């Protein structure tokens, strides 16, 4: 059965983006919403990028909450998982790591009546827009912008500071050993 056969013309779905710096609770918020839909018996499928090797086959928050996720290399792989079963909600964690194809995939799912919720970093460690998150924010029906707490002063943190100097590459998979939340005042410029 093809993708288009599974999804007939449906009313348009909604798109929600959860964004903010590291340690702001993006994955926790995503998992909270997923749990609510599952309790209401709404079919949900969760995807994450394979490049994020911190928790294989899981979307897991720092609070210890988790749910099973399908690891994919390309956003186009999402279509392969939607040909057999109908899902009302597609959840995508760490979306900043996907190619720009993620925007077209989210739009096409939305046009087919599938609700899509995406979480990811909106800026990198240089406070520059990260990946395709800005384009996803532009098409979102709802945006949940979260803050962390600055590790230096305790004020609201909107930025992620890389605290290791391995490279200037934008993508360096890590956690508390490599990054910490910072307010605008306490984030030095570029890396």
From Swiss-Prot:
Catalytic machinery residues: 94 (proton acceptor)
Subunit and interaction comment: Homotetramer.
Keywords for this protein: ATP-binding, Cytoplasm, DNA synthesis, Kinase, Metal-binding, Nucleotide-binding, Transferase, Zinc
Binding-site residues, Zn(2+): 150, 153, 183, 186
Location, primary (coarse class): cytoplasm
Protein name: Thymidine kinase
Top EC group: transferase
